[in-house]
A protein has these predicted regions:
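Bacterial N-terminal signal peptides
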Residues: 11-20
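Bacterial N-terminal signal peptides that target proteins for export
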Residues: 1-12
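Lectin-like carbohydrate-binding module/patch detector with strong preference for beta-trefoil
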Residues: 28-169
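Sec/Tat signal peptide C-region and signal peptidase I cleavage site
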Residues: 22-28
């Protein structure tokens, strides 16, 4: 009986460990992270709005969100600096007016998002590398989309809720 009890206990422990490993693996695999470095040969990303599509394009030093009819857009532009060789990243609204300065980078933008494949909630952010002016250390800067609305959509400024999908990368 003692051997049977030990064997049963070992079997139950093995099943429990296997179950924990499966749950952990599934939790990790639920998220898909995709990176794009914008260097002039970037993918076009279609943003699916409940009513219409927004388009994200990257050409040269510009990263642009735009409505297909051109009635509204938002642009991030990298300006080369003659002082230190870095690019200054500035944000413009659809009227072409600068809204804010968001950082600087030695190379390009990187687009990163994580998608929950079971109930696709999408976290979207811009990432770029820079150098801390005080310590001289390399740092990573992140510009995040403002808010999560529910399990399906993210809110982009005042534009409503969107879903982001890779199209041609």
């Amino acid at each position: 009986m003692n051997k049977f009890l030990k064997a049963t206990t070992a079997f139950i422990i093995a099943i429990a460990i296997t179950a924990i490993m499966i749950v952990t693996a599934n939790a990790e695999s639920r998220y898909i992270e995709k990176n794009f470095t914008f260097d002039g040969i970037a993918p076009t990303v279609i943003i699916h709005h409940p009513v219409y599509d927004w388009v994200l394009t990257a050409k040269g030093n510009k990263l642009t969100w735009q409505k297909p009819n051109g009635s509204a857009s938002q642009m991030f532009v990298m300006f080369p600096s003659e002082y230190d060789g870095y690019y200054r990243i500035r944000e413009f609204n659809n009227g072409g007016y600068e809204q804010r300065y968001i950082g600087y980078t030695p190379s390009g933008f990187k687009l990163v998002w994580q998608e929950d494949v079971q109930a696709p909630a999408i976290a979207f952010k811009l990432v770029w590398k820079a150098k801390d002016t005080v310590s001289g250390k390399s740092v990573k800067n992140v510009w995040r989309m403002p808010c999560k609305m529910n399990n399906k959509y993210f809110c982009v400024g005042g534009w409503g809720c969107v879903r982001i999908e890779q199209t041609n990368a």
